[in-house]
C-alpha cells in the first residue's frame, strides 16, 4: 500500500503545487516542492491503477470493520522528533511515509481515525494511540478517544 499511497500523495501535491503563483514558490517547504515535482511525472495510467487499488483496500477495510468496533494502533511508528525534518536523517526509508506508517493506510482507505496522547517515552517524548472505525463512524471514533483520555489523564 505504500506505493499506492505515495502515488496519490505525490500526484495530489503536484496538483496543489501547480496552483502556487511563481513568485511564491520560494516560500514553499522544500520537501513539499520535491514531492510535488516528483508527482508531476506520475503517468495517468499509474494514478488510475493506484485508485483501483485504493478502492479495493477501502472495501477490504470496510469488511474488516464490519466485524470490529475499532482498530487501535500506535499513532506513529517512531517517537516525536525535531522539526523541520520529516523524519530523522538516519532513516533510510521514504522519508515522507516512514513516520506515518500507521496513519497513511487509514487515510488511503478513508476510514475515520483519531489520535490521542497515551503516554511518554523514556526520553519524555509523546506517544499517541490511534482509534479507527468504519466509514461514517466519525462520532464513534471521537467518543472512543474522548473516553480513553478521560480514563487515562
Predicted regions and their residues:
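Structural helix-boundary/capping segments
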Residues: 42, 48, 59, 67, ...
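Short helix-loop capping/hinge segments that flank enzyme active sites or metal/cofactor-binding pockets
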Residues: 7-62, 112-125
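Short, surface-exposed loop/helix-turn segments at secondary-structure junctions
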Residues: 5, 49, 80-100
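Acidic helix-start/capping segments at beta-turn-to-alpha-helix junctions
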Residues: 1-7
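Short glycine-/small-residue-rich Rossmann-like dinucleotide-binding loops
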Residues: 76
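Small-aliphatic-rich amphipathic alpha-helix that forms the alpha element of a beta-alpha
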Residues: 93-116
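Short, basic, helix/turn surface patches
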Residues: 12-28, 100-101, 137-150
Amino acid at each position: 500500500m505504500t506505493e499506492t499511497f505515495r502515488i496519490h500523495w505525490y500526484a495530489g501535491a503536484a496538483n496543489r503545487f501547480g496552483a502556487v503563483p511563481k513568485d511564491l514558490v520560494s516560500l514553499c517547504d522544500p520537501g513539499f516542492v520535491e514531492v510535488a515535482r516528483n508527482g508531476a511525472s506520475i503517468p495517468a495510467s499509474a494514478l488510475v491503477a493506484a485508485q483501483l487499488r485504493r478502492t479495493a483496500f477501502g472495501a477490504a477495510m470496510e469488511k474488516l470493520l464490519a466485524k470490529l468496533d475499532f482498530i487501535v494502533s500506535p499513532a506513529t511508528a517512531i517517537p516525536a522528533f525535531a522539526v523541520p525534518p520529516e523524519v530523522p536523517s538516519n532513516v533510510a526509508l521514504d522519508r515522507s511515509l516512514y513516520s506515518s506508517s500507521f496513519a497513511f493506510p487509514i487515510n488511503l482507505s478513508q476510514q475515520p481515525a483519531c489520535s490521542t496522547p497515551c503516554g511518554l517515552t523514556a526520553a519524555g517524548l509523546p506517544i499517541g494511540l490511534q482509534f479507527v472505525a468504519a466509514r461514517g463512524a466519525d462520532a464513534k471514533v471521537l467518543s472512543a478517544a474522548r473516553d480513553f483520555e478521560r480514563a487515562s489523564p
